[in-house]
């Protein structure tokens, strides 16, 4: 029995760490969401929720800070590369790119946003409805660039990824009294799931067919939450993790039901919780040495402008860390998570 368990572990690690390829199956990846998938849109709007400065991007191509909340690539960049597309997915608002670049992939995501408009209002970032408006604009540009028929085909054949929701709880519901005075946690989850449902329906109405709706990670294990979990020795905040599991279950059921209602749709719920929790519970198996603190600065509270260049506490090798800043994973973690989610999700679309 022990040998079988060891064999399973080896096979699992190979699947998680190897580079997955699905080349030639998808013409483009279209992305909506928050900082987990923002490649720099916030650089071009008036908000403090930015990361277009060092040490962010220090392990990116050319050591360039792009606005990704990471030391390097984010998960969607690795997914694009695995599909045989470009090695990164550019931000829609970045003027250094144009429709020829966006034709194979684009992200409308905005760091610090959420399903709830009240969440995006906190730091004046792009709400989900505005991301959808930009997508409509993108469709017009794409059809002008590729021609109406080919543009329509690209829209219908592209893969749509949605990664959002953590900020609704950690930066809104539990941070300010507004929503928590209006809703219980369960009712707020239902409120957000309803917004997610309507967003997917609107995407489908605009021609999207292959849609992956992402769930929440174990958000109680982020370094920031561990650091504020006084009296536990820096353990994960169990309540936040429980909320993530509950919300993921509601999204999963919603997607299953909605997929039967929308004609020609291929909807999949992509759950990052378990693969991320496996990293957190057994970091050494993935080559990590530090899981409870981040690489940047003290590793407990800093993100964004708190992660300043030349901070003497910032680590020298981010690959040893699960988290880059107090809220976001390192490039290495993003790569592992991208492979895990591609293995579980992409076969449904190919």
Curated annotation (Swiss-Prot):
Q: Which family does it belong to?
A: Belongs to the 'GDSL' lipolytic enzyme family.
Signal peptide: which range, if any?
A: 1-23
GO terms (molecular function) for this protein are: fatty acyl-[ACP] hydrolase activity
Where mainly located? secreted
Q: What is its EC number?
A: 3.1.1.-
Question: Under the cellular component aspect of Gene Ontology, which terms does the record hold?
Answer: extracellular region
Q: Which keywords belong to this entry?
A: Glycoprotein, Hydrolase, Lipid degradation, Lipid metabolism, Secreted, Signal
- Compartment(s) where it occurs, according to its Swiss-Prot or TrEMBL record: Secreted
Which positions does UniProt annotate with glycan attachment? Answer: 98, 117, 343
What biological processes does GO assign it?
Answer: lipid catabolic process
What CDD domains does the entry give?
SGNH_plant_lipase_like (cd01837)
Question: Mind telling me which InterPro entries this protein's record contains?
Answer: GDSL, GDSL_lipolytic_enzyme, SGNH_hydro_sf, SGNH_plant_lipase-like
Q: What class of enzyme is it?
A: hydrolase
Instruction: List the active site.
Output: 35, 325, 328
| Full protein name | GDSL esterase/lipase At2g04570
Q: Which PANTHER family match?
A: GDSL ESTERASE/LIPASE EXL3, GDSL-LIKE LIPASE_ACYLHYDROLASE
């Amino acid at each position: 029995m022990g040998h079988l368990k060891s064999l399973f572990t080896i096979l699992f690690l190979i699947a998680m760490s190897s580079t997955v390829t699905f080349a030639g199956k998808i013409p483009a990846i279209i992305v909506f969401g928050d900082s987990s998938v923002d490649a720099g849109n916030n650089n071009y709007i008036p908000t403090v929720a930015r990361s277009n400065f060092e040490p962010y991007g220090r392990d990116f191509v050319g050591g360039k800070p792009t606005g990704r909340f990471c030391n390097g690539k984010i998960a969607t960049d690795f997914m694009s590369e695995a599909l045989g597309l470009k090695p990164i997915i550019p931000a829609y608002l970045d003027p250094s790119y144009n429709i020829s670049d966006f034709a194979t992939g684009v992200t409308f995501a905005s760091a610090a946003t959420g399903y709830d408009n009240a969440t995006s209002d906190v730091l004046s970032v792009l709400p989900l409805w505005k991301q959808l408006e930009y997508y409509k604009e993108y469709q017009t540009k794409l059809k002008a660039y590729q021609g109406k028929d080919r543009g329509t085909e690209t829209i219908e054949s592209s893969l749509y990824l949605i990664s959002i929701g953590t900020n609704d709880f950690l930066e809104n519901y539990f941070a300010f009294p507004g929503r928590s005075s209006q809703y219980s946690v369960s009712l707020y989850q239902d409120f957000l799931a309803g917004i997610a449902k309507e967003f997917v329906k609107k995407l489908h109405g605009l021609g999207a067919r292959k849609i992956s709706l992402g769930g929440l990670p174990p958000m109680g294990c982020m370094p920031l939450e561990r650091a504020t979990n006084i009296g536990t020795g820096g353990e994960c905040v169990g309540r936040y993790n429980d909320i993530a599991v509950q919300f993921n279950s509601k999204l999963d059921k919603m997607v299953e039901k909605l997929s039967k209602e929308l004609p020609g749709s291929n909807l999949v719920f992509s759950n990052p919780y378990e693969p991320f929790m496996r990293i957190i519970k057994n970091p050494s198996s993935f080559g990590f040495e530090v899981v409870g603190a981040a690489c940047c600065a003290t590793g407990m509270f800093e993100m964004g402008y708190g992660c300043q260049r030349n901070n003497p506490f910032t680590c020298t090798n981010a690959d040893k860390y699960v988290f880059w800043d107090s809220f976001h994973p390192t490039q290495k973690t993003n790569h592992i998570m991208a492979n895990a989610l591609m293995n579980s999700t992409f076969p449904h679309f190919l």
